[in-house]
């Protein structure tokens, strides 16, 4: 059992109890043999884990009147890596205890997670340049890239690296599943002080770095049931529902409408209609015409 899963179990258990004594925590720990192996949890171990949890997740576990509690629960309510890790490892714990029904639990593979992700994360930690051969799907031409790794992002079941390419003198995104001959160099770099990964992608859709596309407020209408889907799983972090009618909703997003954005809306078929701005609406109409021409009889 990895230490991270033990940390996740500790966080989830304390969160569910709000406040819990060491004795209660130890009993629950020993009872969950898939995590503990049947061993109890002592104070010294818990305090060591508490320090590791604070450093790794930014979650502060405090003790008052012999009761342990999470002092900054707001961290758990925020989106981002901490919440993603908690959800992921909580799911793994549940699946590990469900081997009897493993044939009835279906998942989607993320093949790129097996390709260089650990190496890239280590390079991120050490601010070291990485080098790899990259082959785009578009042209199939392999290129050697030397990159300052800025961040990684998971999108549509693929991991991507955002970094500054030394050869092309600019920020680029790279799909891990298109990399070969990967290596970490000894050369170090300094991450720009003003770089914020979340802020950088806040006006982008997906993994695009097309800063030449103007950032706009796009208004679109979604019909039932897709309005419900979009309400449950927003298209973008800026999404707002500005109107709710009988069988439809009107949403707004603030982003750079790139190909990935249009592609995502097109995937909803006739259940989504762009209302404004006119330029974005026209671009969508042109795409629909091009799609229609593929099905016209010669």
Q: Can you say where each PLM-predicted feature lies in the sequence?
A:
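A residue-level signal for conserved active-site and pocket-lining positions in enzyme catalytic cores
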Residues: 10, 46, 127, 220, ...
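Bulky hydrophobic/aromatic content
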Residues: 8, 22, 57-58, 62-136
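General beta-strand recognition
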Residues: 69, 131, 160-162, 250, ...
């Amino acid at each position: 059992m990895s230490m991270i899963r033990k940390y996740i179990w500790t966080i989830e258990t304390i969160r569910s109890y709000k406040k819990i004594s060491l004795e209660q925590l130890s009993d629950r720990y020993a009872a969950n043999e898939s995590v503990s192996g049947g061993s109890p949890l002592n104070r010294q171990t818990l305090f060591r884990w508490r320090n590791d949890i604070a450093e790794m997740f930014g979650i502060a576990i405090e003790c008052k009147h012999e009761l342990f509690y999470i002092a900054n629960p707001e961290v758990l309510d925020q989106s981002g890596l901490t919440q993603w890790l908690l959800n992921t490892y909580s799911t793994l714990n549940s699946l590990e205890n469900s081997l009897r029904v493993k044939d009835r639990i279906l998942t989607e593979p993320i093949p790129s997670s097996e390709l260089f992700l650990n190496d890239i994360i280590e390079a991120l930690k050490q601010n070291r340049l990485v080098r790899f051969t990259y082959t785009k799907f578009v042209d199939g031409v392999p290129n050697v890239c030397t990159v300052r790794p800025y961040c990684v992002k998971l999108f549509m079941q693929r991991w991507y690296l955002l970094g500054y390419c030394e050869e092309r003198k600019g920020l680029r995104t790279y799909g891990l599943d298109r990399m070969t001959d990967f290596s970490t160099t000894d050369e170090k770099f300094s991450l720009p002080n003003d770089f914020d990964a979340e802020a950088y992608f806040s006006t982008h859709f997906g993994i695009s770095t097309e800063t030449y596309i103007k950032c706009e407020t796009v208004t679109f209408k979604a019909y039932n049931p897709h309005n419900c889907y979009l309400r449950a799983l927003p298209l973008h972090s800026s999404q707002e529902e500005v109107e709710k009618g009988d069988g439809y909703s009107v949403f707004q997003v603030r982003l750079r409408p790139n190909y990935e954005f249009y592609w995502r809306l097109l995937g909803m078929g006739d259940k989504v209609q762009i209302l404004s701005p006119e330029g974005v609406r026209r671009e969508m109409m042109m795409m629909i015409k091009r799609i229609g021409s593929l099905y016209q009889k010669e």
